[in-house]
């Protein structure tokens, strides 16, 4: 969705009558909001488990990205963008943690490499789809692409399990306090 938003900026500017400075402020505010929310979500992943938060990330980011398409104004657009950055961004560290905790050492590098390729591959696919979708349907319909990842929630629920190391850590150690982040 990072690529989608970037490609949609000219059309968003035109629809809402925004200056370039206002667009930069929206993008900055969305990333700041997303970063702050991501800290809280990362803390929650250690508290409730990686797998539930990974599923939440897939489900939540799919819907949040799609909801951008119906944003009635700039404030809603910024809030949805920030929330989608945080919720979607959560999948990356959680997936990395699951891979390092679950994969045998001989496969860990391969799977981390496969995880790393997702970002540039997603950006490339978004670039290709965006050209066509923006031209044919406009910026709002572009964000419905976020729903494409919904079937992954079923795959995760069906085939992944909470890493035993994560379960063991939660059962032997008291849950981390939010203030521990700043200690």
Where are each of the predicted segments found?
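Flexible cytoplasmic inter-helical loops of multi-pass small-molecule transporters
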Residues: 158-179
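MFS 12-TM fold signature
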Residues: 34, 58-65, 84, 149-153
């Amino acid at each position: 969705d990072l690529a989608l938003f970037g490609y949609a900026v000219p059309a968003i500017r035109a629809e809402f009558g925004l200056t370039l400075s206002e667009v930069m402020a929206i993008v900055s505010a969305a990333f700041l909001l997303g970063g702050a929310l991501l800290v809280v979500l990362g803390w929650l992943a250690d508290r409730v488990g990686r797998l539930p938060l990974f599923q939440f990330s897939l489900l939540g980011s799919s819907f949040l990205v799609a909801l951008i398409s119906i944003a009635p104004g700039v404030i809603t657009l910024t809030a949805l963008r920030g929330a989608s950055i945080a919720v979607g961004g959560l999948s990356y560290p959680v997936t990395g943690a699951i891979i390092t905790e679950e994969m045998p050492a001989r496969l860990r590098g391969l799977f981390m490499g496969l995880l790393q390729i997702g970002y540039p591959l997603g950006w490339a696919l978004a670039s290709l789809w965006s050209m066509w979708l923006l031209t044919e349907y406009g910026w709002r319909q572009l964000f419905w692409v976020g729903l494409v990842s919904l079937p992954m929630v079923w795959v995760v629920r069906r085939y992944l399990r909470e890493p035993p190391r994560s379960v063991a850590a939660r059962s032997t150690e008291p849950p981390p306090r939010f203030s521990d982040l700043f200690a």
